[in-house]
Amino acid sequence: MRRMLIVAALAATASVASAQPVPVTLSEWKIGMKSDTVKAGPVTFRVTNEGGMNHAFYVRGEGVDQGTKQIPVRQSASLTVTLKPGTYEVYCSMSDESHKLAGMSRKLVVTPDNAPAAPKPPDA
């Protein structure tokens, strides 16, 4: 039994280590991400609160319903999830969803792992 727990813990650690990083910024009233498309598999959202109040980051869809705790102003948090191909919603889950309703919501499209990556938008 102990050996199985160690193997499971190592597999989880390897999954986090190999996860594709997705930087996210939160501020009033938007979620900033370089792309709305990621490849299927483990994804680590690295979320930074650049706003003037607490925020939180949530991912929902295709069997995933997870998020961060409250992220204080100028602080960061990470969330690692395994995403299957499909469409997800990412949003700020603070309060009574008032942040989400104020515009802190966007769609995230997850493509199969072997699909070509979406082109990056040109730098402004």
Language-model features, listed with the residues they occupy:
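Beta-strand signatures of extracellular beta-sandwich domains
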Residues: 56-60
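Surface-exposed loop/edge segments in extracytoplasmic proteins
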Residues: 63-69
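Sec-dependent N-terminal signal peptides
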Residues: 4-14
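A short tyrosine-centered beta-strand micro-motif
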Residues: 43, 86-90
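Short, flexible loop/turn segments at beta-strand junctions in immunoglobulin-like
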Residues: 37, 80-85
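Extracytoplasmic/periplasmic copper-protein system
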Residues: 19-27, 73, 78, 82, ...
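Asparagine-centered strand-capping/turn motif at beta-strand->loop junctions
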Residues: 49-51
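N-terminal edge beta-strand
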Residues: 20-40
